[in-house]
């Protein structure tokens, strides 16, 4: 069937060598996506690029400034850009397309990453029936990050033939039967599901802003770092918060959201109609997220041009929903060690 591939499909693709990797682990497969892992092959570059007319490797040879091995962990310095070959290669067929996104933990550390493929004129895009290597461009923007071979910074979602994104009419019908969002607001569905920011309590922490620090974070260390060394907690003033230029914030949604087990979701990362800021790095929501009682969406926010005032209940992002190609036997949650089920205002899994 057409639609977004599920857990069982990724198992099949790997078994049939449509996804190849010498270091593949079954734990990389999520309900409607697959985590991609870093190889040891890494390059420092001074300019970003796409490779619409060449292989990425051929273009890299001409522009890289330094070759690095990730056999041993290396420090990726803030605001420097690196290209790492991913362990996974693709040999797709049967009209399969897709795209990639940073994982939640990557976005919450303000690590900007995007996938580059051979003969492809768009970042993050998996062209129809793609065959070839995959590379990841990585720029860490708030902290120096220790990166190792095998780390998983991004994820891939594949589809059979076309996207089956649901229109507003379909979403409203589903929302009446099985809530997609828990709120008393009206007009919550408009060009997707509208998600607003929670600045309702002036006496509680509503956000974190990344501190300037020389301390380093090892991407492999989980539940390890003290929050106060890297983040400053913020409280709203008069139910408002000023987003300062070039600073990085973690906030949460006012509403709880739900991704039913027969659907997948994706946050739209930048919407000029909502405001001049990036409202989310990590896009994918797997089936079962927040099911059945809802879970808050955590939002990564940054503005590049001017300071921006956010008010309580202001729309900050949109979620679009898409149909799965079949019912999945695995959903997001504790059974597959999902890190952010039932989350509140949550930093990345690296902090305790």
Q: Model-found features: residue ranges?
A:
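DUTPase catalytic domain/fold
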Residues: 1-352
């Amino acid at each position: 069937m057409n639609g977004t591939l599920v857990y069982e499909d990724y198992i099949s693709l790997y078994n049939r060598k449509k996804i190849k990797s010498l270091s593949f682990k079954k734990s990389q497969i999520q309900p409607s996506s697959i985590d991609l892992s870093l190889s040891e092959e890494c390059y420092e570059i001074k300019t970003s690029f796409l490779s619409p007319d060449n292989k990425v490797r051929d273009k890299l040879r001409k522009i890289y400034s330094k070759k690095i091995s990730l056999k041993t962990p290396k420090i990726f310095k803030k605001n420097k850009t690196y290209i790492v070959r991913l362990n996974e290669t693709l040999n797709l067929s049967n009209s399969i397309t897709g795209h990639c996104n940073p994982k939640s933990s990557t976005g919450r550390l303000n690590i900007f990453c995007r996938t580059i493929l051979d003969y492809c004129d768009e970042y993050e895009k998996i062209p129809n029936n793609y065959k070839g290597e995959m590379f990841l461009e990585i720029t860490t923007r708030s902290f120096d990050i220790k990166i190792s071979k095998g780390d998983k910074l991004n994820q891939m979602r594949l589809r059979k033939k076309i996207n089956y994104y649901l229109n507003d009419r379909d979403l409203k019908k589903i929302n009446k039967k099985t809530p997609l969002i828990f709120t008393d607001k009206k007009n919550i569905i408009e060009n997707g599901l509208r998600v607003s920011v929670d600045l309702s309590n002036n006496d509680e922490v509503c956000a974190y802003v990344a501190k300037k620090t020389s301390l380093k974070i090892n991407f492999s260390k989980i539940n390890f770092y003290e929050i106060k060394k890297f983040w400053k907690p913020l409280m709203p003033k008069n139910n408002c918060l000023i987003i300062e230029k070039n600073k990085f914030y973690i906030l949460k949604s006012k509403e709880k959201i739900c991704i039913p087990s027969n659907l997948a979701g994706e946050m739209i990362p930048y919407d000029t109609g909502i405001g001049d800021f990036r409202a989310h790095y990590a896009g994918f929501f797997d089936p079962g997220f927040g099911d059945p009682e809802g879970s808050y969406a955590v939002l990564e926010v940054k503005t590049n041009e001017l300071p921006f005032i956010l008010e309580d209940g202001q729309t900050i992002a949109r979620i679009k929903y898409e149909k799965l190609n079949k019912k999945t036997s695995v959903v997001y949650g504790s059974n597959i060690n999902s890190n952010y089920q039932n989350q509140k205002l949550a930093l990345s899994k690296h902090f305790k």
